[in-house]
Amino acid sequence: MSSKTLYEKLVESHTIRELDNEGHVLLYIDRSILNEYTSPQAFSGLRERGRTVRHPDTFLLNIDHVNPTRSQRDVLMTDPGGQLQVDYFRENAADFGITLFDVLDPRQGIEHVVAHEQGLVMPGMVIAAGDSHTTTYGAFGALGFGIGTSEIEHLLATQTLVYRKLKTMRVSVQGELPFACSAKDIVLELLERIGADGATGYAIEFVGEAISALSVEGRMTLCNMAVEAGARGAIIAPDKKVFDYIYGKPQMPVGELWQQALLEWSQLSSDADAVFDKTVAINCHDLEPKVTWGISPDQTGSITGRVPFPEQETNPLKRLALEKALHYMGLTAGMLLKDIRISHAFIGSCTNGRIEDLRAVAKVLEGRKIASHVRGIIVPGSTMVRRQAEEEGLAKIFIAAGFEWRHSGCSMCLAMNEDVLSPGDRCASGTNRNFPGR
């Protein structure tokens, strides 16, 4: 038997049949979490064709993209189109018998936070959803990837997808993370090295002592942002940290079934002699806290660094990209990154809106005040995270520092509600993307 990577094992175990000689397979999908933004047309397609949802119990509908995050979360959406999406989403949940986490549900939150809180993500699963950051679930030893609306319709009707197998990339991260560095700095380092398209067509597996040392929530940040390098999957072999983290979650097996699951999950790893199509090595020894400065996640540098000079870039396409970024951001080449003036600060999103993230923010903010010219907003990743942050006294620290303490939702990351910037604003954000308009 040939040696296999963990990614290859997961795909193989979920393959119903091979479709051709070009790597296309019919893939069984274990779970899907759908939001109000990308799924409406999929349900319309089901109705038009007279189809039903094959396994409603494997889906969760969750409102997170367009809902307001201010105190009155049950009021009408600020955008009429958003309100229409929410109304239709509620109708879809009722008509097709799928569980819905509505805006006032105590379990509601950003889908990639809610999913693991509710125990919907288990090692060895294959999960597809209408959001590119479904790669987050790789932190649990699952394969997660985003799909388009037409694929959502197919998945709802058949519980399967036509899937093209990916190449594999091994990213080895060694050494101990320096002070003030986190999983976010690791993935920004990777982006700076390989670029925003460096992992296109690949599934990444993260390995190494630095990965093992990360918390499960840190690993989620890492896998979440792998898609920013073009990866359609990111995975980390599950270990005791993962098993302890998911134990007791609402949908997890219990008793003897839990013990049986542990035996299976503990076998989920790449073979020692498995061959990857590409390898990348990162040593954390010299890593510094990093920040993106431009209009692509790979336009990044150490906080002690400078905005680059486009004329020093030999690649003409990259040089043009740098010039566009400087113009859009209103920056000057050579200026210190730490001197870039901001008007807003945003903490939240499926990348950095979990309780560990908020604890880290509170440590920095305690006893300090936000600058008078900066508007600060903190949006917890879920209602459960919000409640826990308040119980731990974190919310009081945020408010005392001058930040607005909001309810859960995607908020400024996608900006499909009132949480938006105005032309000329510049925001320091804990999200995953810095594209123009986001």
Where are these regions (language model features)?
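Fe-S-dependent hydro-lyases/dehydratases of central metabolism
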Residues: 1-438
